[in-house]
Amino acid sequence: MIAKLQQLGADITPVKTGIIKPIIIPEFADKVRSADWIVFTSKNGVRSFFYNLDLAGADIRLIASARFAVVGKATEKELAKHHIKADIIPAEQTGKALAGELSSYMGDNDEIKVCIFSAKEASPDLEAGLKEICELEKIDAYVNEQAYESIPESIGNMVSEAVFTSASNVERFFHMLPENAYVETAYSIGEKTTAALEQHNVREILQADDSSYEALVDTICYKA
């Protein structure tokens, strides 16, 4: 997304708010070999999955009978790097939408096993939509830790425009700012990010039409 905005002429100051680290998953092979569906909510979940697959000394044959569902185009592309095509990609890029599509595939068969690979601090929406209709296992695949870096002094107490791709980005960014600092215009990737922004000193919030980097870039360009 940064490269795309720079190509369009934007002057970008990246601020690193988090560090993604994969989690070593105990008994990984046993957890996934019987899965009917494997679900990823982000590209980081995909990366952690294959990291653990390698640690287990296994390969793709371990999950030969599984089907795959993902949230978002970026997640779909990351999975495709491993020569796997996602079976379900909801048009609305949210966990709630994915839960709805998965439930239509399952019907009344509550013995279907679904493994969700997501962040340790992930939103519960996807789990909530599935826990009553299948054998569900939510696996903490990675953690997004605070990046202890300083905000560039050139930013000062007023940020004219800032782009946020998750609610955790919002919380960590404002934690790094001086107490009296504010953001003039914030661009949000989705509802949860917007809700987090509403709790802080932001004059204007513009939310993308759908939860994708492409839609977020379009929102920024429209404002410009």
Language-model features and meaning:
Residues 1-224:
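Signature of uroporphyrinogen-III synthase
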